[in-house]
Amino acid sequence: MIRDMRATVNETVPPLTPAHRSSARVHLGPLRGIPLVLEHFGVPSEPVLTTVGLRREDFETPDRSAAFEDLDRLFGLCIRKTGCDHFGLLLSQYVSLQSFGITGRLARNATSVGAALQDLAGFFLLHDSGGSINLSIHNGSVTFGYGIHVPGIRHADQVYDLAVGGMVNVMRELCGPDWRPAVVLLPRKRPPGLRPYRERLLSPLRFDSVLAGIIFPEPVLSRPIVDADSYLHTLLAENASAALARTDPLLHADVRRAIRLLLLAQQCSRREVARHLGLHER
C-alpha cells in the first residue's frame, strides 16, 4: 500500500543567524493547548505569548500561523517559566485531527488508515512548512514519523515530544481509543523521570532514536475508518489540492529537502525527487 516512504533524522546544527532565518511557518491549531498548560502551572499565558507576538485568541483562529523559530523561542520560554522539561509532551494531549484543519478532515474521511496517513503526509505542508510527516514499511512494521528540516531549532526535543504524542492521538481517532503503538521513538535523551511518558504514551519507549515516531503492525493500514464520508473526502481533496497549488514553497529549498530525505531513505533518484515534488521528471 505505502511503499515509497521517507525517513528523516534529528540533526545537530548551529543556531540560526538573522541572515539565515527560515521562512518556515506552522499553523497554531496543534499548539492551542499552550495557554492551558501554562496556566496549569500557574503561569499567566499572555505575558509569555506576547514575547513572540502572539495572543491567546490567535490559537483559536484556524488560519493563524507563526514562524517556526518564534515557536522554538516560545517553547524555551515555556520551559523556563514552568520548570517542566516535558512541556511538549503535555501539550500533545490537545492535538487531534481537527487541529490540522482541512488536512485533518480529509484524513478523517479517508477509506482506510493507510489512506488517511497518505493524506496527512501529502497535504501536511498546508499546516507546517518546517517539518514533514514520514512513513515507511519494513519487515511488516510501519513507522509513522515526523522530522524537522529547519536548521538551528534549539528545542527540537519539545517539538518531537509534541509530534509523537499527537501521532498517538491521531491513530486513536482513526483506530479507536484503546489503540496503542508497538514502540514509541523519541530522539531525545532518556529523561530522569519516565512516568509522564509512560502515562501519556502507554507503550514501550525508545529514547536516543534517530527518528521521532511510532511503530505499529502493517495490517493496521488496511483498517477501514468508521463513518468516513467518501463524497466529503472527494470535495475536501479538491480544496486541499487547490490550496497546495497556491503555495509558494521556494522550489530550490524544496528540492534540497527532498534530496536529503530521499538520500536518508536510500531512494534518491531524479524520478523519486520529481515524484516527491509533484513535478515531471524533466
Give a label for each model feature.
Residues 39, 50, 80, 172-175, ...:
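Short polybasic/polar patches that bind polyanions
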Residues 1-145, 166:
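N-terminal low-complexity or simple alpha-helical regulatory segments
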Residues 117, 121, 164-168, 172, ...:
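Generic solvent-exposed, charged/amphipathic alpha-helical segments
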Residues 132, 136-223:
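DNA-contacting interfaces and partner/effector-binding or oligomerization modules
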Residues 191, 196-282:
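Extended mid-to-C-terminal alpha-helical interaction segments
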Residues 100-107, 149-153, 221-222, 238-242:
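Short hinge/gating elements
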Residues 32, 114, 157-165, 230, ...:
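Short, well-ordered alpha-helical segments
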Residues 26, 40, 155, 159, ...:
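Short, contiguous, pocket-lining structural segments
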